[in-house]
Every structure is written in C-alpha cells, then in structure tokens.
C-alpha cells in the first residue's frame, strides 16, 4: 500500500503508513517511537495541548490534533492523516479516558457518556474511518493486507470497584475488536486487541512508587512490578508486522500474570 515516505529507514515496518491515537504519552508514545524505529511513517494523534508538550526520541512523527469526544473532529483528523501519509497500513486505536467514577449507585449520566464517548465510540469511529481508508487504498487486493490494533485493558474482561463506566467501555472495545475482525477479514484487514495490565506510564518505574500502589502490584502481579509502555509497544510492533499474518480477532494480554491468578495470590508467595 502507499505511504508518504516520512521515514525510509529499514526495519520490520519499513514502507508502512501508521496512525496512532492517544500518542502523546504512555503506551501511545512508546508505540509511535517503536514504529518510527522500525521504519514506518507515523501520524501521532492526540489532544492538541498534549501533542504540543510531547517530544519524541525518534524523529519524523507527524502530529495531528484530535479530540476523541468530538465525532466530526475524528473524521476530519483521520482524513487529514491518511492524506498526509498517502494511504494507511496500520491503525493503533489507543486513545482513552482513564480513571474511576465512584460507586455504581452514584454514577452520573454525564460520567457514563463521557467514558463511553471517548473509549468506546471514539474507538469505533477511528477504526471505521481507518478501515474505510485501508479498503480504498487496496487492502484485500493482490494479497495486500492492513492492520488495526485496539488498546483495551485487563478491564476489558475483569471488573474492579468504582470503575463501571471505564470497565464497560473497555469491554465493548474487546467485542468491537472481534466483530471488526470478522467483518474486515474479506478485505485483508487483521484486527487484534492488546490488553495491558498495570503499566507505569511515567516510563521510569516511579508511577507505582506510592506505598499502597506498590503493595497492590506485589499482591496482584506475578512478576511483582508494573509493566512499561515499551513492553506494550513491542506487541504493537509484532501485530503490525508481516509475521502476524494469521492472527486476527485475538487479544494479547500484557499484565505480568495479573489475570492468571486470584487477586492477592502472590501475598503468601513472596514471604
């Protein structure tokens, strides 16, 4: 498929055109940098203030501002991104609103709408625009394929207290991913989800240094530490490269063993 040629370095994604949403920090930022290192041309999409404050270690990212709560803005930003790239091979839908909203009994309509609008509807609209661009650029013809990677969460299939809106929206992303995989297979578009567990988005192991959070990680994560954004980005590279050509409708869980056991299961094991 066509690319704009912002990056010409050899790598596993050489010649590929990619869009990453939620690109200004954490997993999104690490994915942008990993894709650039692997030779892709990359549009980094996020809220304007966040993009303005972001400096990538790898040169070449094309910043485009977009608010995932604004439906019209999504279509416009995606069209701009595809035009500037000259096509689209890879979409990483990672933009999300994080955090809890209190007990379910106190969950307001406004908070529910806010989380669903960004995390669920924003993902849907981004992926629909991306898939349409991929088909228009020739995905599914002459053996050409494309990739959509959603960023879910262990909360896509595991609940936690006082986060009903976030958990429900992330669960929706999981099923949307599977539905897209089925519908888009005929067009050569492979769709998969990455489900991270606790990730230190500061990137320097300080995000979980607060004693309560540190103890929680020790109790709940088999590896005894939070993940790093770069460890999640590694999976995003794998799912985007040619070697993943028979993987679709699947989830890669990156949680250090959190979902493999009962919460608190490591409490005795570390003594």
Curated annotation (Swiss-Prot):
- Return one GO MF term: N-acylmannosamine 1-dehydrogenase activity
- Residues in the active site? 166
Q: Which UniProt keywords apply?
A: NAD, Oxidoreductase
Superkingdom of origin organism: Bacteria
> What does it catalyze?
an N-acyl-D-mannosamine + NAD(+) = an N-acyl-D-mannosaminolactone + NADH + H(+)
UniProt cross-references to InterPro entries, sorted A to Z = NAD(P)-bd_dom_sf, Sc_DH/Rdtase_CS, SDR_fam
Q: Which residues cross the membrane?
A: none
User: Which residues are recorded as binding substrate?
Assistant: 153
Report residues binding NAD(+): 20-44
**Coiled coil start-end:** none
Q: Which PANTHER family match?
A: DEHYDROGENASES, SHORT CHAIN, ESTRADIOL 17-BETA-DEHYDROGENASE 8-RELATED
Q: What does this protein do?
A: Acts on acetyl-D-mannosamine and glycolyl-D-mannosamine.
This protein is called what? N-acylmannosamine 1-dehydrogenase
Q: What organism, scientifically named, is this protein from?
A: Flavobacterium sp. (strain 141-8)
């Amino acid at each position: 498929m066509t690319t704009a040629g912002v990056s010409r370095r050899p790598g596993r994604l050489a010649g590929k055109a990619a869009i990453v949403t939620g690109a200004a920090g954490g997993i999104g930022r690490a994915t942008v940098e990993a894709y650039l290192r692997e030779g892709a041309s990359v549009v980094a999409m996020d809220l304007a203030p966040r993009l303005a404050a972001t400096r990538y270690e790898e040169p070449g990212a094309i910043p485009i501002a977009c608010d995932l709560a604004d439906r019209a803005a999504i279509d416009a930003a995606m069209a701009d991104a595809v035009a500037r790239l000259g096509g689209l091979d890879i979409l990483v839908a990672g933009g999300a609103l994080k955090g809890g909203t209190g007990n379910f009994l106190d969950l307001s309509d406004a908070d529910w709408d806010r989380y669903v609008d960004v995390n669920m509807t924003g993902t849907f609209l981004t992926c629909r625009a991306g898939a349409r661009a991929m088909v228009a650029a020739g995905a599914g013809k002459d053996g050409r394929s494309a990739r959509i990677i959603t960023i879910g969460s262990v909360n896509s299939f595991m609940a936690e207290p006082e986060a009903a809106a976030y958990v429900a929206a992330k669960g929706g992303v999981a099923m949307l991913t599977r539905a897209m995989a089925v519908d888009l297979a005929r067009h050569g578009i492979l769709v998969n989800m990455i489900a991270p567990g606790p990730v230190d988005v500061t990137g320097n192991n300080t995000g979980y240094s607060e004693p309560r959070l540190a103890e929680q990680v020790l109790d709940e994560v088999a590896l005894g530490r939070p993940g790093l954004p770069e460890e999640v980005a590694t999976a995003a590279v794998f799912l985007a490269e040619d070697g993943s050509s028979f993987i679709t409708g699947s989830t890669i869980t990156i949680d250090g063993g959190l979902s493999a056991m009962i919460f608190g299961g490591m409490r005795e094991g570390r003594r």
